[in-house]
Amino acid sequence: MSNVRLIARLDIKGPNLIKGVHLEGLRVVGNPNEYAMAYYAQGADELIYMDTVASLYGRNNLSEIVKTTAENVFIPITVGGGIRSVDDAEQLLRCGADKVAINTAATKNPTLISDIARRFGSQCVVLSIEAKRTVNGRWEVMTDNGREHTGMDVVDWARNGEKFGAGEILLTSIDQEGTRKGFDLELVKQVSSMVSIPVIASGGMGKLEEFN
């Protein structure tokens, strides 16, 4: 397990940490900064903050949360949700984020990946992919926290995202998310085999044995 990074993902709505199943039925869990510090104390290697409604309402509201966390937590922080421009990315990086994750805006304008990578480096750009299994055994790219269909194939999009300059991929299985029934290993293997950048598996983790 020496090469495995344990990354705590915190989904945010307004000022609250929330949790759901399949990105639906979201309920308030507590204060995101308190949970971030707890995960840090427990040995998390990184943190990911995702604003679950930012793309829907066209805004990013995580600046203050990120500032507070960055003052108390000394591991890399990735922030996503509602990032639509280089300026949006810069604002979050200035607040203390180490990386920004983009999803919805990148599917509409893939050159945003390149623009942010040129300005801050590929190591700062995470392509967030929300994947939903289809009837033909493939996976479709979803956006807006799993609300909207794109018709895009996940594996193809991951390859294109790398070409545009993404330094990592955050791969969330909507079908497994929140279930604690294990990762979609087939999905993770398919994407990982087609790109040379790190792939972060998200959705379904329930016990430590799943890292083996």
From Swiss-Prot:
Protein name per UniProt: Imidazole glycerol phosphate synthase subunit HisF
Recorded GO MF terms: imidazoleglycerol-phosphate synthase activity; lyase activity
Keyword S-adenosyl-L-methionine: no
UniProt subcellular location: Cytoplasm
Residues annotated as catalytic: D11, E130
Enzyme Commission numbers on file: 4.3.2.10
GO BP of this protein: L-histidine biosynthetic process
GO CC aspect terms: cytoplasm
Disulfide cysteine pairs (residue numbers): none
Reactions listed under catalytic activity: 5-[(5-phospho-1-deoxy-D-ribulos-1-ylimino)methylamino]-1-(5-phospho-beta-D-ribosyl)imidazole-4-carboxamide + L-glutamine = D-erythro-1-(imidazol-4-yl)glycerol 3-phosphate + 5-amino-1-(5-phospho-beta-D-ribosyl)imidazole-4-carboxamide + L-glutamate + H(+)
UniProt-listed InterPro entries: Aldolase_TIM, His_biosynth, HisF, IGPS_HisA/HisF, RibuloseP-bd_barrel
Pathway: Amino-acid biosynthesis; L-histidine biosynthesis; L-histidine from 5-phospho-alpha-D-ribose 1-diphosphate: step 5/9
